[in-house]
Amino acid sequence: MEDKNGAPHGAPHSDSPLGFSHAAPEEDTPAPELAPEAPEPPEEPRLGVLTVTDTTPDSMRLSWSVAQGPFDSFVVQYEDTNGQPQALLVDGDQSKILISGLEPSTPYRFLLYGLHEGKRLGPLSAEGTTGLAPAGQTSEESRPRLSQLSVTDVTTSSLRLNWEAPPGAFDSFLLRFGVPSPSTLEPHPRPLLQRELMVPGTRHSAVLRDLRSGTLYSLTLYGLRGPHKADSIQGTARTLSPVLESPRDLQFSEIRETSAKVNWMPPPSRADSFKVSYQLADGGEPQSVQVDGRARTQKLQFLTVPHSCVH
């Protein structure tokens, strides 16, 4: 018996009911492994808004926000009335600073930079004008004056600043000090990074600590009446450089007619090099030889006979 397609009844069909041949099942092909995506670098912190508030005749308060953080620290920059750039370093957990020692009725423009992992980001800018001078403020000729700014007790990391002022003339003193730009040849020299120290009006000296050795500092002292600047005086001072200690236990060995070996113990502090100088005991032209700082001995040759040599 045949079905309507002509195939014997019961015979298996080679075609599907839809007219397609049955294909052998395909083996599953594993999906290609995708390389893990590189993590996106973290976004840099961003500054928000800088505003000027609490304006007085000689000060302004700057406040700022951080849109995305944190920052390691901040730098506030502005120019004084002499056109000199000034800068103040602020800790990263702070969001405001009082800028004092300004001139009355004077416009100022401030720039705020954020420092993050050695990079300077920004700036934000804001402008403000100091208030009018207080009524009855003394004239330039009659106002009390600071004088005799001097430096004593200088060490590698500190110095004492002294000054003279009329008794009772100032309520307090504001001392600003910082390191000038290392190069005046830069097209845009970096301004002073300053620190501040408040001193009671009854004291006429202050010790500056935690300074860099062998470094020149710019100093500005303000005399304040209340919050207002009455006078200022400027100067500079340099801390001492580290003193290199001398080698010790100098000895001679292997002494010959025209040569000798000199030995020494190095100082506790690191030395880049040593200079061995010698000459005839009864005078004559001094000789010297430069020795690497890691050396502990040096042979002196071509010495004159029969004289001895001294160090």
From Swiss-Prot:
Domain of life: Eukaryota
Keywords from the UniProt entry: Repeat
InterPro entries linked to this entry: ECM_Regulatory_Proteins, FN3_dom, FN3_sf, Ig-like_fold
Domain Fibronectin type-III: residue ranges: 41-135, 145-249, 250-311
GO cellular component, one term: extracellular exosome
Region (Disordered): 1-47, 124-150
Tissues in which the protein is found: Expressed in the adrenal gland.
Further remark: TNX genes are located in the class III HLA region within a complex locus, named RCCX module, containing genes for WHR1/STK19, C4B, CYP21B/CYP21A2 and TNXB. Most chromosomes bear 2 modules, but monomodular and trimodular haplotypes are common in most populations. The bimodular haplotype results from the duplication of the RCCX module, leading to a duplicate containing RP2/RP1 pseudogene, C4A, CYP21A/CYP21A1P and TNXA.
Protein name per its UniProtKB record: Putative tenascin-XA
Annotated organism of origin: Homo sapiens (Human)
